[in-house]
């Protein structure tokens, strides 16, 4: 079957029919990727442009699937930006919050894995999509703005550290998490509570996306109430592998309001659950990979130099409320502390 005929055929499927044939469609696309890999660049570009054109006539959820194929196979930023704009513009009735969140993680992960996919607008689009999703989840939970626990009521010796994934110590982000917790508890004398929100590459509500990637999750950690690291013992909680779960988010907010930590440290960013909790106590986000776009908290610590929109060469974060650019060099901030 020729490519054009194949696209025309699947474009006639409704969503149920598409998912029933999803494995076959993915197999056909994988075979097409192998064929495209043997062609000259000009031929490959022509075929991808044909697919892009035909995708324009498809339902938006199907268009996202086909554009994700074009993005990964072309290895060019143009398709990344078109895909992100398609997700941003998609009506909630066609692509809901959970599906858009899954798309956010899939695209961000692809860009992190292959820097060639990142264009001039990619980071801006990821940030806009994250903010859109954060606002949607806040709306679902009835959260209308920051409502901090009064500073005089907060426990100055208690810090909540949240992250979207906890694996073994050979996993670099987990090691970063434990290193930060060690500094806070052993050297700064804080009581640290670690919460794995399990929001990393959420598969809940995932829609069609080419070569979908999944995050690691260790269910056995749900049975632990503490973690030991270099002689320190940390209180530990892990969310079930069904995030984002609105009931679980409410429970975490209630825990924040009841235990009243002095602040919340979000390791990794791009964690809507952590950012929602950050509406009730000050939140500091420590980025790890592509997560610089994904933070809503009051402050952020970036681990690499970032281009400042004001022209400053230092690292920067932007206050989403005031639009003020707060610039500083944060290369060694956490290590020195």
Where do the PLM segments sit?
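Short, charged/polar "capping" segments at the starts of alpha-helices
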Residues: 201-209, 273, 293, 308-313
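Active-site-proximal region of nucleotide-activated glycan assembly enzymes
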Residues: 117-125, 280-336
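Short N-terminal targeting/anchoring amphipathic segment
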Residues: 254-271
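N-terminal subdomain of nucleotide-sugar transferases
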Residues: 1-62, 67-70, 90-222
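Alpha/beta-hydrolase active-site loop
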Residues: 242-256
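A short acidic, amphipathic alpha-helical/loop segment
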Residues: 251-252, 272-279, 297
């Amino acid at each position: 079957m020729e490519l054009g005929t194949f696209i025309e055929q699947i474009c006639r499927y409704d969503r149920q029919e598409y998912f029933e044939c999803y494995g076959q469609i993915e197999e056909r696309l994988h075979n097409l990727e192998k064929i495209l890999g043997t062609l000259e660049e000009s031929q490959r570009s022509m075929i991808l442009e044909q697919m892009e054109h035909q995708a324009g006539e498809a339902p938006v959820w199907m268009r996202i699937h086909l554009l994700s194929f074009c993005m990964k196979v072309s290895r060019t930023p143009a398709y990344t930006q078109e895909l992100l704009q398609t997700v941003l513009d998609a009506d909630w009735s066609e692509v809901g919050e959970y599906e858009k969140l899954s798309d956010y993680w899939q695209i961000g992960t692809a860009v992190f894995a292959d820097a060639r996919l990142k264009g001039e607008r990619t980071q801006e689009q990821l940030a806009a999509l994250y903010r859109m999703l954060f606002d949607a989840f806040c709306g679902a939970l009835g959260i209308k703005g920051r409502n901090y626990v009064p500073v005089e009521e907060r426990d100055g010796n208690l810090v909540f550290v949240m992250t979207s994934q906890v694996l073994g110590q050979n996993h670099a982000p987990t090691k970063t998490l434990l290193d930060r917790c060690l500094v806070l508890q052993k050297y700064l004398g804080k009581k640290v509570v670690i919460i794995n929100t399990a929001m990393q590459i959420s598969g809940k509500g995932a829609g069609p996306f080419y070569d979908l990637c999944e995050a690691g999750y260790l269910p056995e950690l749900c049975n632990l109430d503490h973690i030991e690291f270099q002689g320190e013992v940390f209180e530990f909680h892990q969310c079930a592998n069904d995030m984002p779960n609105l009931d679980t988010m409410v429970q975490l907010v209630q825990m924040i309001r009841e235990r009243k930590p002095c602040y919340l440290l979000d390791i990794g960013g791009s964690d809507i659950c952590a950012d929602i909790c950050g509406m009730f106590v000050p939140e500091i986000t420590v980025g790890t990979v592509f997560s610089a776009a994904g933070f809503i908290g009051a402050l952020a610590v970036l681990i690499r130099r970032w281009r400042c929109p004001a022209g400053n060469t230092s690292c920067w974060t932007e206050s989403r409320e005031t639009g003020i650019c707060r610039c500083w060099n944060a290369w060694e901030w956490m290590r020195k502390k």
